[in-house]
């Protein structure tokens, strides 16, 4: 059903719009002073009232991300691709969503170490997730999106990786504003990568979740009679 394509689009629109609204709130109420430099995403969402909105935006986004990851996992299985990579990809997708929720609920001003752990899961593991999805895009058949979706995912994943490295380097050089800009771009790329699943989900007609019982091995009559005689 084509309506499934709306799910990743909703995540992209919700998350992108949500964090920019949080940024606007933090600037308008003076929680963030732009004369001190461009803020990190988490700095914008540290103080109330925008911290409440920030947490809600990321919690809903995390829920949608888990939903998308599970559907994508099953879709790939339905294409008879039973690669271990698909299972590992599901696990990393769920970890990415968990990290996103942690970032929203543990502000850096209150629980810095927990917040940083969540950021690692959201950004680093999230990037790994989309590298795996890029590989799976080339492995499965049919290939939705023609010959374009694979290269697009590949280029966006490269850009995401490069910007994460740049973010760490600029932070080490104490160029926090530039590092923060890199973080914002990484977040936008990750949201866009989630949105690209709309191309795959458009073709979800005929895909079903199956719950199968384990087959019970029943001995044949010869085996039963042999056992009986031996007794």
From Swiss-Prot:
Cellular component aspect of the GO annotation: autophagosome membrane; endosome membrane; plasma membrane
GO biological process terms on file: autophagy
Main localization, broad class: membrane
Compartments where found: Cell membrane; Endosome membrane; Cytoplasmic vesicle, Autophagosome membrane
Membrane topology category: Multi-pass membrane protein
Segments on the Extracellular side according to the record's topology features: 23-50, 105-115, 172-183
Full protein name: Modulator of macroautophagy TMEM150B-B
Source species of the chain: Xenopus laevis (African clawed frog)
């Amino acid at each position: 059903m084509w309506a499934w394509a709306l799910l990743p689009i909703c995540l992209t629109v919700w998350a992108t719009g949500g964090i920019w609204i949080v940024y606007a709130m933090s600037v308008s109420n003076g929680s963030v002073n732009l004369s001190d430099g461009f803020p990190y995403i988490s700095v914008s969402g540290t103080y109330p009232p925008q911290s409440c909105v920030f947490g809600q935006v990321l919690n809903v986004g995390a829920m949608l991300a888990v939903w998308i990851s599970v559907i994508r996992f099953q879709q790939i299985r339905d294409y008879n691709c039973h690669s271990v990579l698909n299972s590992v990809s599901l696990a990393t997708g769920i970890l990415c969503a968990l990290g996103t929720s942690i970032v929203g609920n543990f502000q850096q001003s209150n629980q810095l170490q927990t917040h940083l752990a969540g950021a690692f899961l959201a950004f680093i593991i999230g990037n790994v997730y989309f590298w795996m999805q890029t590989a799976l895009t080339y492995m499965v058949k049919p290939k939705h999106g023609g010959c374009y979706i694979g290269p697009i995912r590949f280029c966006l994943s490269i850009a995401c990786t490069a910007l994460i490295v740049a973010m760490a380097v600029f932070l080490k050089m104490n160029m926090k504003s530039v590092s923060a800009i890199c973080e914002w771009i990484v977040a936008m790329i990750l949201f866009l990568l989630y949105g690209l699943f709309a191309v795959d989900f458009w073709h979800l007609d005929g895909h079903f979740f199956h719950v199968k019982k384990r087959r019970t091995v029943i001995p044949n009559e010869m085996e039963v009679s042999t056992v009986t005689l031996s007794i």
